[in-house]
């Protein structure tokens, strides 16, 4: 079996706010919730591919993240990029704007922005050209 992505996990100090962002702004449906001892969620899994075979895991964190510029030169995960169709790009840009999410960088193929906790996210149609 060839290697394939299973999931990406992002730690969130405000899990509910992050879940709302990924569900309401990006339209990712909830696959599963993992409860936390004492109530609430420890983790929320969101489908990225519509089939549930690739997902984004939002994990509860204990402290808020430090603000980071778009490129900070530090090693580690730089961004999570999600695939869109080239013909959908303008609609996605409008959706982000309507939700108050600023696009911080653009290329020919990709829109870059931050989630509520400063994680870098991209919507890309690379290498598809429209």
Model-derived regions, located:
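Short, small/polar residue-rich loop motifs at catalytic or cofactor-binding pockets
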Residues: 106-108
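Short glycine/proline-centered loop/turn elements that form peptide/ligand docking sites
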Residues: 34-41, 130
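Glyoxalase I/VOC metalloenzyme domain signal
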Residues: 1-5, 12-32, 48-103, 114-130
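Short acidic loop-to-beta-strand element that houses the catalytic metal-binding Asp/Glu
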Residues: 44-46
């Amino acid at each position: 079996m060839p290697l394939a992505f299973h999931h990406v996990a992002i730690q969130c100090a405000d899990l509910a706010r992050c879940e709302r962002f990924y569900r309401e702004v990006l339209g990712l449906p909830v696959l599963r919730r993992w409860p936390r001892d004492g109530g609430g969620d420890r983790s929320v899994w969101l489908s990225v591919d519509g089939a549930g075979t690739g997902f984004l895991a939002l994990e509860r964190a204990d402290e808020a993240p430090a603000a980071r510029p778009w490129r900070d030169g530090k090693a580690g995960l730089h961004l999570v990029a999600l695939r869109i169709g080239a013909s959908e790009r303008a609609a996605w840009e409008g959706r982000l704007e309507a939700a108050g999410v600023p696009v911080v960088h653009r290329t020919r193929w990709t829109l870059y922005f931050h989630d509520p906790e400063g994680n870098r996210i991209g919507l890309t149609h690379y290498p598809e050209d429209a």
